[in-house]
Regions:
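A cross-kingdom feature marking charged/low-complexity
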Residues: 147-165
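Structural motif
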Residues: 59-60, 111-113, 133-134
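Helix-rich interaction surfaces within compact, conserved domain-sized segments
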Residues: 121-140, 146, 150
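Short His-Asn-centered micro-motif
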Residues: 63, 114-117, 137
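N-terminal, charge-rich interaction modules
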Residues: 2-86, 165
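Short, flexible, solvent-exposed loop/turn segments with mixed acidic/basic and small polar residues
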Residues: 95-106
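Structural alpha-beta junctions
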Residues: 83-95, 130-132
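Short cationic amphipathic helices and targeting signals
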Residues: 106-116
């Protein structure tokens, strides 16, 4: 079986289990570009700086990179990212370039911060692009991780992680 690089930067033979993946996503760092400045947001933390800059009622970080958390290669990731961007631009939603990276600063995935998107539409975007999880939060509340699966027995007990299945 081929080796793959996980969000934790380690080489593995299989994608991480969902519980492990949730821990990695929750520990990751996320950035949105507004103007010429990057703003940090993280699971379980307030994103007041982002909210001050963008003034939306809700926020979603979504990417099309590495569907099902399996490395897809740069060409396939860029192609999927273009499809996601086109889909988002066809809506009336405001979007800003964003990225996520593991806690060590590697394993970067490019995506979008989508403004004023509802839970259902946000979850549909995640599923349509094969994402195991996305970030979602309402203004004034901490950033939440939304995993697109039922909660497995090995999942962390985290008050900022929602299991949608």
């Amino acid at each position: 079986m081929p080796m793959i690089r996980a969000m934790d930067g380690e080489l593995e033979q299989t994608p991480p289990a969902l519980g492990d993946l949730a821990r990695l996503y929750a520990a990751a760092h996320y950035f949105v570009v507004v103007g010429r400045k990057e703003w940090l947001f993280q699971v379980g933390q307030s994103a007041a700086d982002v909210e001050r800059q963008l003034g939306a009622g809700s926020y979603q970080f979504v990417t099309a990179w590495n569907p099902r958390s399996c490395p897809a290669g740069e060409a396939r990731n860029l192609e999927a990212a273009q499809v996601l961007e086109q889909r988002l631009r066809e809506t009336s939603l405001s979007i800003h370039r964003a990225l996520g990276c593991n806690a060590q600063g590697g394993a970067v995935e490019h995506g979008w911060l989508v403004l004023d998107v509802g839970w259902d539409q946000a979850d549909a975007l995640a599923r349509d692009f094969g994402q195991a999880g996305t970030l979602y939060w309402l203004a004034g509340e901490p950033v939440r991780l939304r995993m697109q699966a039922p909660r497995p027995h090995d999942a962390p007990d985290d008050m900022f992680t929602d299991w949608t299945g």
